[in-house]
Design a protein with these regions (language model features):
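Intrinsically disordered, low-complexity non-transmembrane regions of multi-pass membrane transporters
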Residues: 1-38, 72-73, 78, 194-216, ...
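Entry/N-cap segments of selected transmembrane alpha helices
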Residues: 32-41, 88, 99-131, 219, ...
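Core mid-bundle transmembrane helix pairs that form the ion/substrate translocation pathway
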Residues: 40-41, 197-260
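Flexible hinge motifs at transmembrane-helix junctions and intramembrane kinks/re-entrant loops
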Residues: 43-62, 66, 70-84, 231-245, ...
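Structural signature of hydrophobic alpha-helical transmembrane segments
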Residues: 49-65, 85-89, 111-122, 144-148, ...
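Hydrophobic transmembrane alpha-helices of secondary-active transporters
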Residues: 60-73, 79-109, 249-259, 271-297
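Alpha-helical membrane segments and immediately flanking helix-loop junctions
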Residues: 136-178, 328-367
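C-terminal transmembrane helix pair
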Residues: 182-186, 312-391
Length: 391
């Protein structure tokens, strides 16, 4: 009996999912490139009217809003805010701030109880404001709390999506709060210090050309180490890992290098371009949340503005308490207790060269406390929600 065996090759089906992911990644890169390209002239234009070290954040906010709105209006394409760009921006800013801290953060360790008290006060106020907002807007308590507790636009919106809550509303209130703080506090600081404002606006020409080739290898090394540390911090879910990890690298990089026996006396500082890019990315991601907003009614916007106003009032009360409990001046207290925009507020203190160590420690304590306590907050909010539904 003759038997013939035929072997049919098994053809792998094309991975449409991988192709879609690649296309999405390319679209995100193109959008980010356009935003950066637009943020440059906007930052330069703002620098003509506003002398300060964080104009690139404002340029990024405008660029992110305009580009995403343009995608929606002209191409009927609604890209989501780029959270990866936010992480990279936080890492760049953390690296810049860390390398600029000449003092020792342990010198302000005695103030940690004050920082913890102020953080708990702001969290308690955020909970009360969230309850009031939920009653006014007739929304569930979990959505209201996620919208009003200072914890970052991206983080709170992502949690709202995980629990099937009103993501656009959470992002709206958080974006209003962060934008208001980021735009208002620098102008208050500039007005208060007057001629003592340190004009650290970073010209593009200086940022691009002020690259010391002898330190280019060190720049690549520090970026590689920062990327590794930030990746591990995010992987192990360390609170505010992208900012905190880069900050530690910025503080300790020179000391670690000088401890090596085969390395001489080295003092490395990241070039201004890193600061410019970090500020742009922070601003762009804030602006993207504005460009991504659907249409809200006047009543919804009114309630959102009321909750933000209450949050700002709570921050002002916390600043007054800090003035009574410490020897800090009022500007330091204002920067420490500003409800949101931690990296941006530290940048303001850096531009002013005003108690950078105190402001940095205060915001780090708050970031760690808020992110570490999120599971407890979520448990309580969901429990209160279920009880209210039963009643």
């Amino acid at each position: 009996m003759n038997q013939s065996i035929s072997i049919t090759p098994v053809l792998e089906e094309p991975t449409h999912q991988d192709t879609a992911v690649a296309k999405l990644f390319i679209k995100q890169l193109i959008i980010l490139f356009l935003e950066m390209l637009l943020a440059l002239p906007l930052g330069l234009l703002l620098a003509k009217f506003y002398t300060g070290g964080i104009v690139w954040i404002f340029g990024g906010i405008a660029a992110g809003t305009l580009v995403l709105q343009g995608c929606r209006l002209f191409y009927q394409y609604s890209p989501k805010p780029n959270r990866t760009a936010r992480k990279v921006g936080m890492a760049f800013v953390g690296l810049t701030i860390g390398s600029s801290i000449h003092g020792n953060l342990t010198s302000v360790a005695s103030g940690i109880p004050i920082f913890i008290f102020l953080t708990l006060f702001l969290l308690l106020c955020g909970g009360c404001i969230g309850y009031i907002y939920s009653r006014m807007s007739q929304t569930n308590l979990l959505t209201a709390m996620l919208a009003t507790v200072p914890g970052g636009v991206g983080i709170m919106a992502a949690i709202a999506a995980d629990y099937n809550r009103n993501v656009p509303l959470v992002a709206l209130v958080q974006a209003i709060r962060v934008t208001t703080v980021v735009l208002t506090i620098p102008f208050i600081a500039r007005t208060s210090v007057g001629n003592y404002w340190n004009p650290q606006t970073l010209p593009v020409k200086s940022a691009l050309l002020n690259l010391d080739l002898s330190q280019l290898k060190l720049l690549l090394l520090v970026l590689l180490v920062t990327g590794l540390v930030v990746y591990l911090a995010i992987l192990f879910k360390i609170p505010a890992g992208d900012f905190f990890g880069a900050l530690l690298i910025g503080i300790g990089f020179n000391s670690l290098l000088n401890c090596l026996p085969f390395v001489g006396d080295i003092h490395f500082s990241p070039p201004p371009l890193i600061n410019v890019l970090g500020q742009m990315l922070l601003g762009i991601t804030i602006g993207e949340y504005w460009g991504d907003k659907p249409t809200f009614g006047k009543q919804t916007l009114g309630y959102a503005l009321m909750s933000v106003a209450m949050t700002l009032a709570a921050g002002a009360i916390a600043a007054i308490l800090a003035m009574q409990l410490t020897s800090w001046d009022w500007l330091t207290c204002l920067l420490v207790t500003a409800p949101g925009g931690s990296a941006e507020m530290i940048l303001v203190s850096l531009a002013l060269n005003h108690n950078v160590e105190i402001v940095t420690t205060g915001h780090l304590v708050r970031l760690i406390a808020i992110n570490s306590s999120l599971p407890l907050w979520l448990f309580l909010f969901r429990r209160f929600d279920s009880q209210s539904e039963l009643s």
